[in-house]
């Protein structure tokens, strides 16, 4: 935990629909991030995590993104994904900690009590969207609270990002270790997250997703023609 405090964690992920979806490419992204001074990596899928572990000696936050019919939860949604991540030896496992129903009509509280009991020594990060969720996750034994899902649930859509107000409340009211994640596009926003009380921070798209970055610039050009 001390290794990631006060530093930058870089999210190195590419979905199956993206050109850079390849474990080797993600491992090189992680290597480049380390060269740039990153203190940790957030990665998706066991194959990417294993490839990254061979390339860099940095703490890794691991997730498995998987869609299940009938549920909007897709970040490490079931115990099956948790078990797969535990087998990789990943340092921290991040799970969706929103109040949305999980696959099999399971609520977060039931899900997390089970995995906390099975893996008492594993560090877990709660990907939350609002204060209520963070408070519950901390009470249940989550080690880190992330603002990852703020703005992405139906009840938080339109929330300004990065979620500085949520970071501040988690830090001051709950005394939690807060992972600022989501909506950090420029260094000034990263600074603001830390001033709001972040323990550490994750930045992804603006560093490791060239297709999305390119689209952002192209869309800016389109407004010139309007």
Regions found by a protein language model. Give the residues of each.
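Glycine-rich phosphate-binding active-site loops on the catalytic face of alpha/beta enzymes
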Residues: 13-15, 64-68, 88-102, 144-157, ...
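Short, surface-exposed connector motifs at secondary-structure boundaries
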Residues: 31-37, 115-121, 172-176, 197-198
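Hydrophobic faces of well-ordered beta-strands that scaffold small-molecule active sites
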Residues: 6-12, 41, 60-64, 93-95, ...
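Short acidic, glycine/proline-enriched helix-loop-strand junctions
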Residues: 57-58, 106, 119-122, 175-176, ...
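Conserved N-terminal beta1-alpha1 strand-loop-helix module at the mouth
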Residues: 1-87, 118, 124, 132-140, ...
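Catalytic cores of alpha/beta
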Residues: 70-85, 129-143, 176-180, 184-201
């Amino acid at each position: 935990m001390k290794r990631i405090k006060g530093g930058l964690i870089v999210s190195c992920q590419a979905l199956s629909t993206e050109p850079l979806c390849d474990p080797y490419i993600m491992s090189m992204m992680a290597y480049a991030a380390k060269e740039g001074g990153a203190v940790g990596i957030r990665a998706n899928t066991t194959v990417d995590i294993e490839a990254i572990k061979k390339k860099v000696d940095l703490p890794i936050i691991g997730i498995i993104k998987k869609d299940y019919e009938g549920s909007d939860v897709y970040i490490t949604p079931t115990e099956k994904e948790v078990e797969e991540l535990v087998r990789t030896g990943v340092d921290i496992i991040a799970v969706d900690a929103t109040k949305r129903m999980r696959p099999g009509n399971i609520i977060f509280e039931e899900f997390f009590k089970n995995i906390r009991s099975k893996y008492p020594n594993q560090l877990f990060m709660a990907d939350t969207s609002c204060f209520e969720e963070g408070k519950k996750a901390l009470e249940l034994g989550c080690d880190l609270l992330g603002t990852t899902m703020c703005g992405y649930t139906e009840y938080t859509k339109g929330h300004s990002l990065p979620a500085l107000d949520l970071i501040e409340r988690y830090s001051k009211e709950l005394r939690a270790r807060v992972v600022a994640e989501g909506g950090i596009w420029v260094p000034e926003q990263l600074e603001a997250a830390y001033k709001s009380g972040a323990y550490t921070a994750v930045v992804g798209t603006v560093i490791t997703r060239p297709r999305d970055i390119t689209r952002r610039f192209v869309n800016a050009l389109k407004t010139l023609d309007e």
